[in-house]
Amino acid sequence: MVLSTLIMRASDGLPLSASVDDGQENLSEQKKQCKLVTQKLSANSADRASIESGNYVIHYLMKDGIVYYCISESSYPRKLAFSYLDELDREFQKSHGQEALKEGVRPYKFVEFDTFMQKTKRVYQDTRATHNLDKLNTELQDVTRVMTKNIEDLLHRGHSLDHMSDLSSNLRTESKKYRRAAQRINWEAMIRQYIPFIGVGLIGLFMLWWMLF
């Protein structure tokens, strides 16, 4: 389940909003890590990623200068986590997007956005809900290729989020290559399957032409 949500400005890490009631979980370390991750983000970074942190996973979505984070249990489906973040992005951009990027914005200026976060989070708490399963099958972008990184690798071993973007790009390229190869193989198999019939048909036409002319 989604345990906590944070929204930050990508350019300077300014916290814009956060979920207020995070239950009994102590997520202070993961929240600090979200701030550190924001500092590492750049224009070349992957626009979405999952970062393993102990028993939890930090999912982020970076879009239009804003970074949306949700901290979930490690067993929570990534597809639901990113669908949740996509919904937050759509609503936040509609209501606060332009203002959030202005200079002089105070930290947590949009704390009232928590009302929408809490309402949306409740929809995504039950992974068995029909509504959620429909989203998995119809509305989601393809996040199966979203890279997963370990927080230790990212913060203490200097691994780059830009590298994650490169890996995602490579995966997309490889996927297209294999898809083209599969189409070629299917085409060749179809030719092998029907070429005897085509050959017989051509011979028959030739014999008919020979007899008539």
Curated annotation (Swiss-Prot):
Ranges of the Cytoplasmic topological domain: 1-192
InterPro entries: Longin-like_dom_sf (IPR011012), Longin_dom (IPR010908), Sec22 (IPR044565), V_SNARE_CC (IPR042855)
Organism domain of life: Eukaryota
Cellular component aspect of the GO annotation: endoplasmic reticulum membrane; ER to Golgi transport vesicle membrane; Golgi membrane; SNARE complex
All copies of domain Longin, residue ranges: 6-117
Keywords: Coiled coil, Endoplasmic reticulum, ER-Golgi transport, Golgi apparatus, Membrane, Protein transport, Transmembrane, Transmembrane helix, Transport
Membrane-spanning residues: 193-213
GO biological processes: endoplasmic reticulum to Golgi vesicle-mediated transport; intracellular protein transport; retrograde vesicle-mediated transport, Golgi to endoplasmic reticulum; vesicle fusion with Golgi apparatus
GO MF terms held by the record: SNAP receptor activity
Primary location class: membrane
v-SNARE coiled-coil homology domain span: 132-192
Membrane topology of the entry: Single-pass type IV membrane protein
Pfam families associated with the record: Longin, Synaptobrevin
Compartment list: Membrane; Endoplasmic reticulum membrane; Golgi apparatus membrane
Alphabetical list of SMART domains matching this protein: Longin
Family indicated by similarity: Belongs to the synaptobrevin family.
Function according to Swiss-Prot or TrEMBL: Required for transport from the ER to the Golgi complex.
Protein name according to UniProt: Protein transport protein SEC22
Gene: SEC22
